[in-house]
Amino acid sequence: MPHSYDYDAIVIGSGPGGEGAAMGLVKQGARVAVIERYQNVGGGCTHWGTIPSKALRHAVSRIIEFNQNPLYSDHSRLLRSSFADILNHADNVINQQTRMRQGFYERNHCEILQGNARFVDEHTLALDCPDGSVETLTAEKFVIACGSRPYHPTDVDFTHPRIYDSDSILSMHHEPRHVLIYGAGVIGCEYASIFRGMDVKVDLINTRDRLLAFLDQEMSDSLSYHFWNSGVVIRHNEEYEKIEGCDDGVIMHLKSGKKLKADCLLYANGRTGNTDSLALQNIGLETDSRGQLKVNSMYQTAQPHVYAVGDVIGYPSLASAAYDQGRIAAQALVKGEANAHLIEDIPTGIYTIPEISSVGKTEQQLTAMKVPYEVGRAQFKHLARAQIVGMNVGTLKILFHRETKEILGIHCFGERAAEIIHIGQAIMEQKGGGNTIEYFVNTTFNYPTMAEAYRVAALNGLNRLF
């Protein structure tokens, strides 16, 4: 006799991965509950990560644009804004996103339960509710989409009022004059751009020998130069020995013997999965040292009825990928297999000022693979649209096979790079010979547009062939 459960599936977490899974499940007729530990849906992406940091970046970049525009750039009219004012803009965006996502669940009759979930046995969850009560919930299957949080080394005092992580930085109550950022990954570089754009002194401590080493080296070098040119001090190959909070700021002692002092520290060196409170040992699951779960191609864990998506499974740790992972897991959960799968070349968008975006192979990868490739480039400063709007900093680079003309990689540095990249991505995904750099020469672009950079870069690259 079949067992009766409260739900067909319970999704733990309402971030992009949880939302993708929940929507995919209810659209297939499943009875679904979503457990969210916080009062509002959306997860870290909406409340502490992607949305607020990009809203901050947008506000700061508009201030920079205003102050650099020759129409407004006389010194009597310089635009200034406090960190608190800019945070208010981010709050408005967060509220809009929360209302919209709450509506998705309500329209699709997907139940939202608030509290902390922990496994009791293979098909039972205990839900610790905000009022102190404990509910017992059963489901045939589960999707773990509980996300991640900033990694906290034990020797750093995050209770100090001037020591922040990438979540708590959004609750900063003072006006920073000098910021130390430890960790020059994506988050560290994005916040370095934001603070420097607000005319705050920034020291960026990088534990490696160059910024964002996964990028094409020209893109990484462009960011380094732009930081240097704007006054960001980058210190490569450094690790902290000790971090001490004091009354007026933070002192960082580096293993190299250097000492740095600033009025606050943003620690942005790694993240860890939010799995420690799930009591996974009760269902025979183990995580790695960073709290992450291993999954197969259908996002099943070692327990076939338990799936995991998003940051909690590690790479690529992107909101865009998490939503797709949730959708794929939902299909596998209901049908036993998934027809869809993540695309091989996931685009990368890094929201520094200016933006960086890429898809496909880098020059370094193609050289190591001994692929005969050629390069086509377009400088933004030569595009009419960029000249009109004053976006002179930037470049688009297309890597393509010398013989087949197949596009192998696209890399963009400059304002709107994360949007521009998708034009090239669409062509790269074409089958049956449709992926060719000649498309950009044989099609007609609106004029003037930033998209026209593809035509310029394609002509530049094809003219190099002999």
Swiss-Prot record:
Co-factor binding comment: Binds 1 FAD per subunit.
Top EC category: oxidoreductase
EC number: 1.6.1.1
GO cellular component: cytosol
One example of a Gene Ontology biological process annotation: NADP metabolic process
Cofactor requirement: FAD
Location(s), subcellular: Cytoplasm
Residues noted as binding FAD in the record, renumbered to the chain: E36, R37, Y38, Q39, N40, V41, G42, G43, G44, C45
Primary role: Conversion of NADPH, generated by peripheral catabolic pathways, to NADH, which can enter the respiratory chain for energy generation.
Protein family per UniProt: Belongs to the class-I pyridine nucleotide-disulfide oxidoreductase family.
The name this protein goes by in its record: Soluble pyridine nucleotide transhydrogenase
Originating species: Escherichia coli O6:H1 (strain CFT073 / ATCC 700928 / UPEC)
